[in-house]
Amino acid sequence: MNYLKQLKQSGEFEYSLAANAEEIKHIEEELGILLPEVYVNFLSECGSCNYGDVYINGIYKEKDTISYPVVELTKQLREDLHLSEDFIVLHYEVDEFLTLYKVSNKIRLKDAKVFEAEVFCNDKGEFKIDKPTPMFDSFEEYFEDFLSLGED
C-alpha cells in the first residue's frame, strides 16, 4: 500500500517525514518488540499522520526535530495503566479510549489486528483500561478507515 500517496490525495491530512531504518530500530529497542512489516512500511513512508486531532502515531520528524510519540505513549501507558507489552499505542484519546496494535517481541509479524480499549475511572478514582477488543483485522484496514475521515 502506498500510504503517502493516499494521504497526499487529500489536503486535509498532515504527515511527517519518512523514518529510516535506524529510527525504526530505535522504536523496537525502546519498547522491546518487533514491529509488524506493514507498520514498518507505514513508518518508512510517512512516519506518522493525523487528520485534525485523530492520529496514527509513529515517528514525528521535521527538518531538525524528531520525536517518538509511539514510544512515549506506549511506555507511559504501560506504566500508568499497565498496558500489555503485546501492544503499541496508535492513538490515545486522553482518559477515553485507546487504539492499539498487536506486536510481538519474538517474531516479526507481517500484519496484526488493531484493537480498541476504553479507558475508565474506577471507584477508587484510578484510571484503568478495559480488555482490548478487535476493531480491524489489519493495519491496512485501520488505515483505510482513517482515510475515510477525509471524505466527510
What are these regions (language model features)?
Residues 34, 85, 134-137, 141:
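Generic recognition of short, well-ordered alpha-helical interface segments
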Residues 92-119:
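Amphipathic protein-protein interaction modules
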Residues 138-152:
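Charged phosphate-binding loop/patch that engages nucleotide di/tri-phosphates or the phosphate backbone
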Residues 63-66, 70, 128, 132-136:
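Intrinsic-disorder-associated interaction segments
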Residues 112-135:
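A short, surface-exposed interaction/processing loop segment used at functional sites
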Residues 1-99, 149-152:
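A surface-exposed partner-binding patch
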